[in-house]
Amino acid sequence: MQIYKLNKEDIPGVWLTIRPFLDSALNKYEVSKKFPLECVLRDLVSGASQGWVIVNDSGVVVSAIVTEIEHYPLGDTVIIFLMGGESMGDWGDLLHNAIVKYAEEMGAKWIETGSRRGIGKLFYDRLGYKRRYESYSYEVKCE
C-alpha cells in the first residue's frame, strides 16, 4: 500500500476515481446536506483542502481522504474531513503516519477527525487519539 498527497492540479485528472469514495463518505453521515460534493471538488481544486489517495499493491485506489488545515489562535489543526474507502485495517496506520508527518511539516499542533464509535475504538483509540466530544445534529424543518 502507498499513500499519496495530491497536488491541486492533479484533482481534475483523478476526480472520477476518488469521487465515489468521497460521495459515499458524505452521504453516510448526511454531511452532503450541508456540504455538497461540488464544494468538496471546489475546495480541492482551489487548494483550500488537501486530497489524498491510498493505492494498493495492484495500483488500485482503495481510499480517498480530504484534509483541511484550521487556524486557531494557539495553533493549527489538520482536520481529516472526509475519508472513504474499504478495509481501513489494511491502511489505517499508513494514513495516520502520513497525516502526522504532514502535520509536522505544516507546523500543526493537532490532528482531529470525526468517526463512528466502532472505528474509533478499533483504530483511533489504539493510536493515541483522545475522544474529546461527541457530535450531535438536529435538522430544523423550515415550513
Set out the residue ranges of the language-model regions:
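Short amphipathic alpha-helix that is part of the acyltransferase structural core
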Residues: 1-35
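Residue-level detector of flexible, active-site-proximal loop/helix-junction positions
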Residues: 10, 87, 142
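Active-site rim helix/loop that mediates acceptor-substrate recognition in acyltransferases
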Residues: 30-49
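Conserved donor-binding loop and adjoining core beta-sheet/short helix segment
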Residues: 46-89
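Short glycine-aromatic motifs
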Residues: 48-49, 124-131
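Acyl-donor binding region in acyl/amide transferases
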Residues: 73-126
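Conserved catalytic-core motifs of GNAT/GCN5-like acyltransferases
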Residues: 114, 130-142
